[in-house]
Amino acid sequence: MLEGPILAVSRQTKSVVDIPGAPQRYSFAKVSAPIEVPGLLDLQLDSYSWLIGTPEWRARQKEEFGEGARVTSGLENILEELSPIQDYSGNMSLSLSEPRFEDVKNTIDEAKEKDINYAAPLYVTAEFVNNTTGEIKSQTVFIGDFPMMTDKGTFIINGTERVVVSQLVRSPGVYFDQTIDKSTERPLHAVKVIPSRGAWLEFDVDKRDSVGVRIDRKRRQPVTVLLKALGWTTEQITERFGFSEIMMSTLESDGVANTDEALLEIYRKQRPGEQPTRDLAQSLLDNSFFRAKRYDLARVGRYKINRKLGLGGDHDGLMTLTEEDIATTIEYLVRLHAGERVMTSPNGEEIPVETDDIDHFGNRRLRTVGELIQNQVRVGLSRMERVVRERMTTQDAESITPTSLINVRPVSAAIREFFGTSQLSQFMDQNNSLSGLTHKRRLSALGPGGLSRERAGIEVRDVHPSHYGRMCPIETPEGPNIGLIGSLASYARVNPFGFIETPYRRIIDGKLTDQIDYLTADEEDRFVVAQANTHYDEEGNITDETVTVRLKDGDIAMVGRNAVDYMDVSPRQMVSVGTAMIPFLEHDDANRALMGANMQKQAVPLIRAEAPFVGTGMEQRAAYDAGDLVITPVAGVVENVSADFITIMADDGKRETYLLRKFQRTNQGTSYNQKPLVNLGERVEAGQVIADGPGTFNGEMSLGRNLLVAFMPWEGHNYEDAIILNQNIVEQDILTSIHIEEHEIDARDTKLGAEEITRDIPNVSEEVLKDLDDRGIVRIGADVRDGDILVGKVTPKGETELTPEERLLRAIFGEKAREVRDTSMKVPHGETGKVIGVRHFSREDDDDLAPGVNEMIRIYVAQKRKIQDGDKLAGRHGNKGVVGKILPQEDMPFLPDGTPVDIILNTHGVPRRMNIGQVLETHLGWLASAGWSVDPEDPENAELVKTLPADLLEVPAGSLTATPVFDGASNEELAGLLANSRPNRDGDVMVNADGKATLIDGRSGEPYPYPVSIGYMYMLKLHHLVDEKIHARSTGPYSMITQQPLGGKAQFGGQRFGEMEVWAMQAYGAAYTLQELLTIKSDDVVGRVKVYEAIVKGENIPDPGIPESFKVLLKELQSLCLNVEVLSADGTPMELAGDDDDFDQAGASLGINLSRDERSDADTA
């Protein structure tokens, strides 16, 4: 095992079977895992615990390494690294130590409400030493507010919940590489020494067999120049590398005689154009590789170099390079080039000589949240260090105190910048519980110091054998980020060096032991690993003579049982949590499984959740760890339960009250609602789920509904993946979800005076104001639709010269008569709903508002969205489709007992997509709904009884089943159970042994000629709702320059009639239609007003004029000093300026500003 502070030691959490009150699932699993899945949020929580050094983390470290072990947190490490900061003369120094946190200023809910950070003040002890007088001054210094992680692994930044994603990067270390020379077709070898921080050092052998070196990507020079610069004599070089002809020939031709010449030569190559001196050259070389301030391998880099070059742990604490490192690297390179397979290291250890695979997980490590924040704090502290040095030289030595030296702004700015703008600090995906959980377990190769999606090739994106058990081969986005963003596998954890480990069961002499070892990808390469389904007896002895195993580089082989070293702990070890929730995954094509895993994260929580008939056994654990359930840590009795809170009288006599979150808006606009699961007086145990969250049912992840599905075409209405639904689903709110939108408005100080929130809005009827209270804010419970006023607001207009009458009115009525504009907040186009919440912040109530803002109001509008044509539905196997038709219940096909089908899917959606899992799920779903009874005495069931677990012989109707991935129900078991399914209450078996039933056409009452596959499938309603996509415009805002309509629903834009559409019109010869589209329907500013007037007055449409964009084009050409003129038919130049006066008057008389641009539209929104 590796030594050092455990970064993310996985704590054994509750086993699913131990969770009190867990619903029973009948599982088809044949393999029992010796350990439970580790805590699914440990990746985030443990890394942050290491950073700030929580008491629990310190206790675990001491337990692991003994009481006397020195335990340092991430923050302590940086302060030790930085201290002492000395001035340029070395007379004074400042040391920082003992970081500690005070209590957090606001609760999580307060931080969300006030749009501030959930953070705790960080203090450090600063000690100033005056070396000349020996005087020591010590003070506690406030560094800034440090964002704290919530118990769900998230951060609250500016009131929104964010997640810091772990980054996959190339590990520091030494990497050997081989390329084939195009001209000679000989292999050429190179090596890179990559530090965590500092200059790269590269050696290579070129096609002329000379060994060269590049320092920090600069010009190449002979490697012997570097060795001589390090103080090696020609004799020493010959003694060490005399075995290599290419080194000797390089030595002869290097052109430098001694150390001084070599140093100057290196300086010339590194700093061309500067005058070299020996001291400058020496300090350049020292700073590049041998000074800890400038060069840092990090512990992981030192570990990788020692391991690759066989240098042992004799200088484990040294984070810079040594001469021995450089010499051994060169020796390894020349032996590799010579084709040798092994070499003896300076320690006498025999090590293999081979090139490295950069995509291997032994060479890629994780920067988890703690390390990412630590790096950012380091950046801030190094900026602060410069300020401290400057202040030491400028201030009087007698009066200096630590606080006068330290400027904490760079540190807090660096932290703020990271959380606010870094690519790895992301707006949390709160669409449902699963999407939040998988977001926290995401691994990204993008971000600062990582890859960019433009430069990443196929190799780095591809699935690698070393991903097994570490990163899921299925769950990754479609599109440009494919393969660059992954998900941590179910059982994986992160070791002290940031490498991902996965657990294996130890096998000794063909016998299983109780020992579980976590192996990195490098370590695993040395062992022979068997699959989790390897047969063994009760004693643990492997029963098969030969076993299928995995060798290095993913090769599969058959070996004798005594040759096996390890065995997988579980069949679902290789997949992530999201993928592990797809039943019959083993029967799905990988492309469709990828879509299935991703689409589960897009499912919207429904009003009434329902657990899937066919699960995988992962639903309980995923929901438990996601953090959206309410779990009681104490045992006791429920003393009070309501929709808003649950009070438990604990066994020790203390009362615990749990507040439930009701109808809160998530980041994605879905509804976050918790519902109690316990009753008054009920006994609860520690660890029991007492309230469900969004998308959970009885503590299980429940993202969709079980629907009775028939696979058949229906009049072509389910062509191309369209879906036919039963009207009953709409009426009974089976696929109905609640969506909450937040609308915000603020009243500011303007140049002309302060804006005012008021009910007194000019030119607005009382009917429009009926739902506003006396402050001008909409009442809670009001039903609103697009265009309705939510908050009344008036803004002062520019004052004009007042007439005597107006001055008189102003004198009598005071301010009321002044000019104001209506800038009220209205419901955006296309939105409706019910007002469920109002938040009012004002400067008078001492709320913290942005400068210039006097009041801020937030309105929450909830909308109940029933399923409708155009909404997207999906199963868990990548089988997605759009609702094409909602049929009346009486027209739907029905079973002989009168049960109508809920949903019809097209059979063509299955074969070429090869996601057969959906068909098997349908069969098992029917079985779970109907129940089954297997008679063990019946000879026809003999084979079935052999494989079926004993508790699955009798299963009642309406039961929940589990078919774990790669270890689920077999085809034979499904066929056997279908033959033994229970009849309905009339004694009839509806579905035959082949999983098909005779369906009757709801319209004619005639049975269909062929039997139809029917059963229950778990269907999800995805967040691609037609309400959010459908859009239409008659008039609206125009772009300020081209005067063409804006684009997109958010801008209330038009539909672009593009180049290809114009060609289509030209091809049809539709000249007048085309002219209209390009002028009066687009940017003929005068023409469109005249057309509007003609339509209103019922007159004929006038002829189009000149489009504005044509005028813009002319102006742009003229700006290039080209004299472009428009000529009439007789050749005389034409003036293109439109008659603006007429057009303004026409618009005014109609009471409409048709030419409004982006700005004025935004003001009136």
Curated annotation (Swiss-Prot):
The UniProt record lists the EC number as 2.7.7.6
Report the SUPFAM superfamilies cross-referenced here: beta and beta-prime subunits of DNA dependent RNA-polymerase
Q: Which GO terms describe its cellular component?
A: DNA-directed RNA polymerase complex
Query: Entry's Pfam families?
Result: RNA_pol_Rpb2_1, RNA_pol_Rpb2_2, RNA_pol_Rpb2_3, RNA_pol_Rpb2_45, RNA_pol_Rpb2_6, RNA_pol_Rpb2_7
Instruction: Give the enzyme's main class according to its UniProt record, as a single word.
Output: transferase
Record-linked CDD domains: RNA_pol_B_RPB2
GO BP terms, alphabetized = DNA-templated transcription
Q: Which reaction does it catalyse?
A: RNA(n) + a ribonucleoside 5'-triphosphate = RNA(n+1) + diphosphate
Q: Report keywords, A-Z.
A: DNA-directed RNA polymerase, Nucleotidyltransferase, Transcription, Transferase
Q: Which GO terms describe its molecular function?
A: DNA binding; DNA-directed RNA polymerase activity; ribonucleoside binding
* Similarity section: Belongs to the RNA polymerase beta chain family.
This protein's assembly is summarised as: The RNAP catalytic core consists of 2 alpha, 1 beta, 1 beta' and 1 omega subunit. When a sigma factor is associated with the core the holoenzyme is formed, which can initiate transcription.
Function, as annotated, reads: DNA-dependent RNA polymerase catalyzes the transcription of DNA into RNA using the four ribonucleoside triphosphates as substrates.
Q: Which PANTHER family match?
A: DNA-DIRECTED RNA POLYMERASE I SUBUNIT 2 (PTHR20856)
The name of this protein is DNA-directed RNA polymerase subunit beta
Which species?
Answer: Corynebacterium glutamicum (strain ATCC 13032 / DSM 20300 / JCM 1318 / BCRC 11384 / CCUG 27702 / LMG 3730 / NBRC 12168 / NCIMB 10025 / NRRL B-2784 / 534)
